[in-house]
C-alpha cells in the first residue's frame, strides 16, 4: 500500500508560519541572518561585522539566537542576560520591562540582545527569536536602526531556527575550506531556497573563515552559483580578540594581521550597504558534494 502525503505550504506546522505581520522589522533596515556550521566562527564574524557597520556610521543591532547566549560578549565585554530569562522574571508580562533590561550597548554604540532559548529538550528556539523581535517592536527599538544582524545557532535548519529568515533581507553563510563546513553550507542553502519562496530573504554570499585557501569553496561556488564575499585567513589576532573579549577593531592595528582583518570587515560591510545582488543558488545533492569536493 502506498501512502501519498498531501503537499503543505512552506513551514506549515512550525512556529514561523502565520507570524503577526506587526512583528515584521521596518522596511529600510538592512537585515542580515548569519548561518554556518557549528563552531565555524559565526559569533566572531557577526560581532566584527556589526562593529564594522558601526564604524561606517550605521546604527546597528545584533541579536544572538543561540541558547548559549555568547553571541555579543566581544561587543559588550561580558555575558548579558537573555530575553527569555528577563521575561521569566516578570512572568512574561513584557509591558513591565524597560529597554535597558534586555538591550545592552556594546562597542561603538552597537546595541546587543541575546534571545536565549528554552531549557534543553523543551520548547522552540525559533519561538524565542520571534518573541525577541516582538519585544523590540513593542518598545520602538527598531525604528531608528540601520542594520540588524541575527547570529543564528549552528547549522540547524529546522522550522524554529529558520525563524530569522522571515525577517532577513540577506543570508550570509560562514564556512571554512573543508568538506564538513561546505556540506553544512549546502544544507543551509537548501533551507534558504525553501524559505525564499514565501519570504523576502535572499542569499548574499559566503564568508570564508579560518581558511588559508579557497579552492574547495570556489569549486562549490562555481557549481551552485554562490559567491565569496569576504575571506578571513587563520589569523591569530582574531583568536586573541576573543580571548580579550573584544572585537577586532579594539585590537592594536600595529599587531600582525589586525589591520588586514579590519579592512576586510569594513569592505564586507560596504558591499552589504551597497545593496548586494541576490544570488540564484542551486544546492547539490549529498552524493554530488562527495563527488565534487576533495583532491583527485
UniProtKB/Swiss-Prot annotation:
Molecular function, one GO term: metal ion binding
Cofactor(s) named in the record: [4Fe-4S] cluster
Catalysed conversion reaction: chlorophyllide a + oxidized 2[4Fe-4S]-[ferredoxin] + 2 ADP + 2 phosphate = protochlorophyllide a + reduced 2[4Fe-4S]-[ferredoxin] + 2 ATP + 2 H2O
Keywords associated with the record: 4Fe-4S, ATP-binding, Chlorophyll biosynthesis, Iron, Iron-sulfur, Magnesium, Metal-binding, Nucleotide-binding, Oxidoreductase, Photosynthesis
Cofactor note as given: Binds 1 [4Fe-4S] cluster per dimer.
Record: residues binding ATP: 39-44, 68, 209-210
Binding residue positions for Mg(2+): 43
Biological pathway: Porphyrin-containing compound metabolism; chlorophyll biosynthesis (light-independent)
Quaternary structure, from the entry: Homodimer. Protochlorophyllide reductase is composed of three subunits; ChlL, ChlN and ChlB.
Annotated function: Component of the dark-operative protochlorophyllide reductase (DPOR) that uses Mg-ATP and reduced ferredoxin to reduce ring D of protochlorophyllide (Pchlide) to form chlorophyllide a (Chlide). This reaction is light-independent. The L component serves as a unique electron donor to the NB-component of the complex, and binds Mg-ATP.
Family in the record: Belongs to the NifH/BchL/ChlL family.
Full protein name: Light-independent protochlorophyllide reductase iron-sulfur ATP-binding protein
Originating species: Prochlorococcus marinus (strain MIT 9211)
Amino acid at each position: 500500500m502506498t501512502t501519498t502525503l498531501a503537499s503543505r505550504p512552506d513551514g506549515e506546522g512550525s512556529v514561523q508560519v502565520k507570524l503577526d505581520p506587526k512583528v515584521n522589522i521596518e522596511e529600510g533596515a538592512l537585515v542580515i541572518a548569519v548561518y554556518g556550521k557549528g563552531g565555524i566562527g559565526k559569533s566572531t564574524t557577526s560581532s566584527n561585522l556589526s562593529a564594522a557597520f558601526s564604524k561606517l556610521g550605521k546604527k546597528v543591532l545584533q541579536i544572538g539566537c543561540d541558547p548559549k547566549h555568547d553571541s555579543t560578549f566581544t561587543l559588550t565585554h561580558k555575558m548579558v542576560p537573555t530575553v527569555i530569562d528577563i521575561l521569566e522574571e516578570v512572568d512574561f508580562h513584557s509591558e513591565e520591562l524597560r529597554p535597558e533590561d534586555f538591550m545592552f550597548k556594546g562597542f561603538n554604540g552597537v546595541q546587543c540582545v541575546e534571545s536565549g532559548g528554552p531549557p534543553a529538550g523543551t520548547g522552540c528556539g525559533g519561538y524565542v527569536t520571534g518573541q525577541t523581535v516582538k519585544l523590540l517592536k513593542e518598545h520602538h527599538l527598531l525604528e531608528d536602526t540601520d542594520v540588524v544582524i541575527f547570529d543564528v545557532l549552528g547549522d540547524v535548519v529546522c522550522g524554529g531556527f529558520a525563524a530569522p529568515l522571515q525577517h532577513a533581507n540577506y543570508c550570509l553563510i560562514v564556512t571554512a575550506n573543508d568538506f564538513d563546513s561546505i556540506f553544512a553550507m549546502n544544507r543551509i542553502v537548501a533551507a534558504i531556497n525553501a524559505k525564499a519562496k514565501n519570504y523576502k530573504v535572499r542569499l548574499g554570499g559566503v564568508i570564508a573563515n579560518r581558511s588559508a585557501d579557497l579552492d574547495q569553496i570556489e569549486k562549490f561556488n562555481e557549481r551552485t552559483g554562490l559567491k565569496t564575499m569576504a575571506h578571513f585567513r587563520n589569523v591569530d589576532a582574531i583568536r586573541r580578540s576573543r580571548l580579550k573579549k573584544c572585537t577586532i577593531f579594539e585590537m592594536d592595528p600595529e599587531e600582525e594581521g589586525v589591520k588586514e582583518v579590519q579592512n576586510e570587515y569594513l569592505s564586507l560591510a560596504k558591499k552589504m550597504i551597497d545593496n548586494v545582488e541576490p544570488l540564484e543558488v542551486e544546492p547539490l545533492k549529498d552524493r554530488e558534494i562527495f563527488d565534487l569536493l576533495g583532491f583527485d
